[in-house]
């Protein structure tokens, strides 16, 4: 018998790959959720928790959005039908969202950065894509100072209370 899922369990997403460095290196303007067109062996490899998006980016090309340089290693049992690990992968977005992304990239200094790859509650592979602007070195130092201050403040409040 199938156990009914609670609302909290239903909304959970299984994160496969995360680009934690992106939140430090870029000022995130807007976040989009995009589907990703994958081959069968790529899905199997992702379900095993393999894959990295640390050095990847996305670009708008000919009215389509492509994920470039994302590494999904070959599936170990995929024999001759395996995929190429770093091939460009098409991202599935609404045309309005593609227009927003294209307009954002056309502006000076904006780029498309993947933040995470995950499986949603329906088992579909999704990419969390951010329209972001690169931070300067002094902005990064400011972020570090702010993070340290928050940590010290929490420590002081914890000791006091």
Curated annotation (Swiss-Prot):
**Pfam families referenced in this protein's UniProt entry, alphabetically:** SmpB (PF01668)
- Localisation: Cytoplasm
* UniProtKB keywords: Cytoplasm, RNA-binding
Signal peptide as annotated in the record: none
Instruction: Report the superkingdom from the record.
Output: Bacteria
Task: Give me the ranges of the annotated region Disordered.
Answer: 140-161
Which SUPFAM superfamilies does the record cross-reference, listed alphabetically? Small protein B (SmpB)
GO MF: RNA binding
Q: Which CDD domains match?
A: SmpB
What cellular-component terms does GO give this entry? Answer: cytosol
Q: What is this protein's function?
A: Required for rescue of stalled ribosomes mediated by trans-translation. Binds to transfer-messenger RNA (tmRNA), required for stable association of tmRNA with ribosomes. tmRNA and SmpB together mimic tRNA shape, replacing the anticodon stem-loop with SmpB. tmRNA is encoded by the ssrA gene; the 2 termini fold to resemble tRNA(Ala) and it encodes a 'tag peptide', a short internal open reading frame. During trans-translation Ala-aminoacylated tmRNA acts like a tRNA, entering the A-site of stalled ribosomes, displacing the stalled mRNA.
The Swiss-Prot or TrEMBL record describes its family as follows:
Belongs to the SmpB family.
Would you tell me the protein name for this molecule?
A: SsrA-binding protein
The record lists the organism as Sphingopyxis alaskensis (strain DSM 13593 / LMG 18877 / RB2256)
Name the gene that codes for it: smpB
């Amino acid at each position: 018998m199938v156990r009914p899922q609670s609302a909290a369990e239903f909304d959970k997403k299984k994160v496969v790959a995360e680009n934690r460095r992106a939140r430090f290196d870029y000022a995130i303007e807007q976040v989009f959720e995009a589907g990703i067109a994958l081959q069968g062996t790529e899905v199997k490899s992702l379900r095993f928790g393999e894959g990295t998006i640390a050095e990847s980016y996305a670009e708008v090309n000919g009215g389509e959005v492509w994920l470039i340089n994302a590494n999904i290693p070959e599936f170990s049992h995929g024999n001759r039908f395996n995929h190429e690990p770093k091939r460009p992968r098409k991202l599935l977005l609404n045309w309005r969202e593609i227009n927003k992304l294209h307009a954002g990239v056309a502006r000076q200094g904006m780029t498309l950065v993947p933040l995470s790859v995950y499986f949603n509650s329906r088992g579909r592979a999704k990419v969390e894509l951010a329209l972001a602007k690169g931070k300067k070195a002094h902005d990064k130092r400011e972020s570090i100072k702010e993070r340290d201050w928050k940590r010290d403040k929490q420590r002081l409040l914890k000791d006091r209370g």
